[in-house]
Amino acid sequence: RVLAPKRVIYIWLICAYNQLDYCAAWQRLWNYVREENLFAPEVEHICVYHDDPKVTEQDKLRTDVCLVLPRVGKPKGEVGVKEVPGGKYAVFRYQGPYENLRAVYDTIYAKWIPEKGYKLGDTPGFEKYLNHPDHTEPENLITEIYIPVQ
């Protein structure tokens, strides 16, 4: 799928992916949205993952916890503003607990990418969360995984 660039507000975090407090980071982003009056019905929750946990030390893994908004304000405190690159992405829809995402990624990188003959793109991939873990049973959580490809 070819995507247009996405304008986001984000908080940059560094630690093991399974130790991130995603909900607290999104709450801080929503506080910024309220303060800056940036409410919009089409907000997307995404995380950009910059590192491979099989290569990078766990305490050095970099993540951007993001809200995609039709208009963004100015950077303020820990909240930054940037563009997630557009381009060609392989998109996978996964339903189930977040704990199983690692196995999904293993399958994508070890089997799907080589079997389909794609090469990885130069930008980081990201996940888009289509429902909320506080209101959804783990087996019903829906995550879209976006892998940049050439």
Residue map of PLM features:
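A solvent-exposed interaction/effector surface
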Residues: 1-150
